[in-house]
C-alpha cells in the first residue's frame, strides 16, 4: 500500500510556467486542498492539474497534484499504461488559464480482452533495472512504452523508477519534457515501439 502511494507521487510530469501564478498542492486522493500560490517560470505558461491512479486489483490508489505546466506537456492530456498482472498506471492532465484548474474524472477501466500482443511489463520503484514480467496487451493496446527516471529527495536520496507496459498509442513525451523540478526529477529514457504479436501454437 505504501509503495503504491510513493509511486503515485513520483510520476508527476509537470512544469513551472512564465508570467503566471498557479495554485500548488499535492495529495493522495481525488483532490487536494489549497496550499499556496506560486509564480511560474519560463518556458511554461499554464496552470494545470494532474490526476494519477495506480490500480492493482483489488487495490487502487489515486493522487491529485496542481502546479504550473508547459504547453507541450498539456498536449499529453492523458496516459494509460498496462504494466501486466492486472496493474494499470493512469494519468489525466488538464490545463487552464486560471490559478485553480479542475481535473477531469477518471473513466472506468474498459472491460477489454487480451488482443494477442505482448510487451515487457514493469512498475518499478528504487531501481531502473526492475524485474520484468510479460504484459498481455488488451483492447487497442498495440504499443510498448518504456520510461526510466530518477526522483531526487533529501531523504532517502535518489529514487529510481521504471515503467514498462502496453499503451494504445505513443505519447508525445521526450527527454526535453522534464519536470518542473529539474534538480529533483530527471527523465532519462522514453522509448515507444510496436508490441509483439504472439502467434498461437498449433
Curated annotation (Swiss-Prot):
| PTM | N-glycosylated.
Q: Which SMART domains match?
A: LU (SM00134)
- Where is it mostly found? secreted
Q: List the disulfide bonds.
A: 22-47, 25-32, 40-68, 74-95, 96-101, 119-144, 137-166, 170-192
Instruction: Specify the domain of life of the species encoding this protein.
Output: Eukaryota
Which interval of the chain is the signal sequence? 1-19
Identify the CDD domains for this entry: TFP_LU_ECD_PLIGA
* Pfam family membership, one: PLA2_inh
Q: Which residues are glycosylated?
A: 177
Q: Which InterPro entries match?
A: CNF-like_PLA2_Inhibitor, LY6_UPA_recep-like, PLipase_A2-inh_b-type, PLipase_A2_inh_N, Snake_toxin-like_sf
- Keywords in alphabetical order, please: Disulfide bond, Glycoprotein, Phospholipase A2 inhibitor, Secreted, Signal
GO terms of molecular function? phospholipase A2 inhibitor activity
Its function, per the record, reads: Inhibits the enzymatic activity of all phospholipase A2 (PA2) groups.
Subunit info here reads: Heterodimer of subunit A and subunit B.
The Swiss-Prot or TrEMBL record describes its family as follows: Belongs to the CNF-like-inhibitor family.
Q: What is this protein called?
A: Phospholipase A2 inhibitor gamma subunit A
